[in-house]
Design a protein with these regions (language model features):
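Active-site-proximal, acidic helix/loop segment immediately C-terminal to a metal-coordinating Asp/Glu
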Residues: 1-24, 84-87, 94, 105-161, ...
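Extracellular and analogous surface-interaction loops
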Residues: 54-56, 104-107
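Short, surface-exposed beta-strand/loop "edge" segments at domain boundaries and coil↔beta transitions
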Residues: 72, 176-177
Length: 177
């Protein structure tokens, strides 16, 4: 969503999720509990999506949990992988389970998470493939520059943003001592 109400609701969902994780809930349990809270909030609450990614820096394992969120993209030596979980947003149905995915990351891999506003701005019906093709064409660069270029690419297709457009990127590199 967009606007002050959507911003406030998103902030509340993020803060509740953070509090649950900080108190020791597993990510899966936290997402299920947040979904229940949104259901109980009822009509005054709008649907929300949640997209959580955790990287174990010792093992290089990425854990992605999605509830209604758009795909996450991983750039590696072989190309771009799309991690997607086509589910309804939080707060719509009871019993919705977060989709869990794990991937082993290697030196030089990059992770890209975008809001639905970024994908919605892209042309065509298969927006995930448009993003994948774009990511396959970009040169290697730092996470901030990559995020800026992805946002510029998406914005180039629309006269003005109609929704939140957020890009979050991360890279994984071996520490050389």
């Amino acid at each position: 969503g967009s606007g002050e109400t959507a911003s406030k609701e998103s902030r509340q969902v993020v803060e509740l999720t953070e509090q649950l994780l900080e108190t020791g809930f597993s990510a899966r349990a936290a997402l299920k509990l947040v979904n229940t809270v949104l259901l109980l909030a009822g009509a005054e609450q709008h649907p929300a999506t949640l997209d959580v990614s955790c990287i174990d820096l010792h093992t290089g394992v990425l854990e992605v949990m999605k509830l209604g969120a758009v795909p996450t993209f991983i750039i590696d030596d072989e190309g771009v992988e799309i991690l997607e979980a086509g589910q309804v947003p939080m707060g719509i149905m009871n019993g919705v389970e977060p989709v869990l995915m794990s991937r082993k990351l290697w030196d030089g891999n990059r992770i890209i998470m975008v809001s639905d506003g970024v994908l919605d701005a892209l042309p065509g019906d298969d927006k995930e493939q448009v993003m994948k093709q774009y990511l396959e064409s970009v040169d290697e660069m730092g996470p901030q520059e990559l995020a800026d270029q992805i946002l510029d690419f998406a914005v180039s297709f629309i006269p003005a943003p109609r929704d939140d457009m957020t890009v979050l990127t991360a890279g994984l590199w071996k520490r050389h001592s």
